[in-house]
């Protein structure tokens, strides 16, 4: 069993997102699962895709650093993403990572004029921090838009059908007890997800 964690936050060591990552890693390792963390800011990942790279990807020519990310994703049974929601979307670092890594021929292909996802058989969970309340986001339908476009929409397109996500809201104003409850929830969901996958393997 292989678990890949993709983390994007510029305050990569002291943010609440990092605390989530640490709990997810611990829960995974306690089950004896091989666990890999890709901390995009600490890695200084280059999120900018060039036109040359875009053209080359369609010909199967992939930069070495992207091939490495392909290997991590290819081997993963569970992919966990941890990131803040900024301007109703991914941080630019994570968006650029996905632009470069979910390349044609790896994440999807084209057959008879239609796209087909190539990442079947993988599960995904996302833990997303937001500055406002979850209830307010739900009131305006933001959660549904995120789900349709950036969460299930994007990853279903690439063949990942088993996608769960959790919004953690008001992270700048809640107290330590509330934060601890969120961390416990992230750990419990990770344990449950991996336990179910282990039972199927």
What do these predicted ranges mean?
Residues 1-106, 173, 177-201:
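N-terminal beta1-alpha1-beta2 submodule of the flavodoxin-like/Rossmannoid cofactor-binding fold
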Residues 92-93, 99-201:
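FMN-binding flavodoxin-like domain, especially the glycine-rich phosphate-binding loop
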């Amino acid at each position: 069993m292989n678990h890949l964690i993709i983390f994007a936050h510029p305050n990569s060591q002291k943010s609440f997102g990092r605390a989530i990552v640490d709990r997810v890693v611990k829960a995974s390792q306690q089950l004896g699962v091989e666990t890999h963390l890709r901390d995009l800011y600490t890695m200084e990942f280059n999120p900018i895709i060039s036109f040359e790279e875009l053209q080359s990807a369609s010909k199967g020519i992939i930069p070495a650093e992207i091939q490495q990310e392909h290997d991590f994703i290819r081997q993963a049974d569970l992919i966990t993403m941890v990131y803040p929601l900024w301007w109703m979307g991914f941080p630019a670092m994570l968006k650029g990572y996905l632009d470069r890594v979910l390349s044609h021929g790896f994440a999807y292909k084209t057959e008879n004029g239609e796209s087909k996802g190539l990442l079947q058989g993988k599960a995904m969970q996302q833990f997303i921090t937001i500055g406002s309340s979850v209830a307010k986001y739900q009131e305006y339908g933001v959660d549904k838009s995120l789900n349709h476009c950036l969460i299930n929409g994007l990853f279903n397109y690439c063949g990942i059908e088993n996608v769960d996500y959790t919004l953690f809201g008001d992270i700048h104003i809640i107290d330590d007890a509330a934060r601890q409850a969120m961390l416990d929830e992230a750990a419990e969901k990770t344990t449950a997800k991996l336990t179910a996958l282990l039972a199927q393997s």
